[in-house]
Amino acid sequence: MKNNKKAFEEACEYIAGGVDSPVRAFASVGSNPLFIKKGKGAYISDIEDNTYIDYVQSWGPLLFGHCDEDVEKACKKALEHGSSFGAPTLAETKLAKFILQDWPHLDKIRFVSSGTEATMSAIRLARGFSKKDKIIKFEGCYHGHSDSLLVSAGSGAATFNTPSSLGVLEDVAKNTLVAIYNDIDSVKNLVEKHSDIACIIIEPIAGNMGLVPAKKEFLQELQALCKKHQILLIFDEVMSGFRASYLGSYGIYNIQADIVTFGKVIGGGMPAAAFAARAEIMDLLSPLGGVYQAGTLSGNPLAMASGYASLKKARNYEGLYEKLEKLGKRLTQGLKEAANDCKIPLQVNCVGSMFGFFFCENPVNNYQDALKSDTKLFAKFHAQMLSKGIYLAPSQFETGFICESMDKKIIEKTIQAAQESFKTL
């Protein structure tokens, strides 16, 4: 049996960088990645048969943990009839109706296979609807790896109007304006200078600079500004949708965006995402309108079955989100108390089943605040926690997730591990 180090060395021979998504390489924490062979509930096991409490949960999709029986059953039943047809199925309509019933400002939806596709398509749709070119995004918010949105992204350099990746053309980046998260004046300044803004896209609960929720007043002012200047407001709820609450940020702030993107939880662990809006906007999509979007595996029956099973269970589970939030708040409270006992500065954020923490003195409200976190200290903490069986995201600038399979005992075990880890820093 290979160990993790040898498995990574072999992967690097055949897979670019040894991984299919950069953060998985553990580069930011200075170690080798774990190769996971199985998971059940709140736990995962690597190829060396080490078991960990998993706070990554596949980066958010697994609301009920690994191998949930209801989701597995739905997938197996769907697979009996075929994995993909490239044709309409009743499963797509079933999931679409189920999602839209609770979002009064969204009339129609279209499924895709990834969050990147969802946000990319939403931007194209907004430009097609408004007949304007420029967009505004926020420093530190990540909306996938399409060219227009890889500007001052969560993982890139915080530089105004500068691509965060080689291969992104300056001619593309120049149409992406960057504002400061939770700072309405920075948005107003851009709107005053540019008359051709098609849309403003934001993570209302940002999860890619660590967890940083928007302030309600800021979102209210943002919505008012968009209405005043006829700019479409896009809420990227790929991470927060059905996670922060059943209705994502809408269930918390009660603010309606013009276009909303979904992902992660709506696939229940299978590749699925979506974007939705009122009919006037959505009917511009081909084949009805002139905005083109397509995908071979979009709406595939396995993902639709998995997503429906997960969302139906979440919607019908009385007290689910209260339980998850209670566990999340206890965890972050325990982490902060443990850090304080060791005189280590730690800021914590928790929204529903999403949480984050930063090794810095002051509260984190935007990307520049997040960058003040001591990433070297985080790397040491991450290694200590991993050695104690706690699997955290291998980056300071990622969000952690609570799943339904977790309980108070698991949370207290994690806090105990943190107490021991802080003492070594």
Curated annotation (Swiss-Prot):
Cofactor(s) needed: pyridoxal 5'-phosphate
> Into which EC class is this enzyme placed?
isomerase
Q: In which pathway does it act?
A: Porphyrin-containing compound metabolism; protoporphyrin-IX biosynthesis; 5-aminolevulinate from L-glutamyl-tRNA(Glu): step 2/2
Gene3D superfamilies attached to this UniProt entry: Aspartate Aminotransferase, domain 1, Type I PLP-dependent aspartate aminotransferase-like (Major domain)
Question: Under which EC number(s) is this enzyme classified?
Answer: 5.4.3.8
Q: Quaternary form? A: Homodimer.
Has keyword Nuclease?
A: no
Disulfide topology = none
Its GO biological process terms?
A: protoporphyrinogen IX biosynthetic process
Keyword Transcription regulation annotated: no
The reactions it catalyses are: (S)-4-amino-5-oxopentanoate = 5-aminolevulinate
The transmembrane segments are none
Protein name, per record = Glutamate-1-semialdehyde 2,1-aminomutase
Could you tell me which species this protein originates from? Campylobacter lari (strain RM2100 / D67 / ATCC BAA-1060)
Q: List the HAMAP family hit by this protein, alphabetically.
A: HemL_aminotrans_3
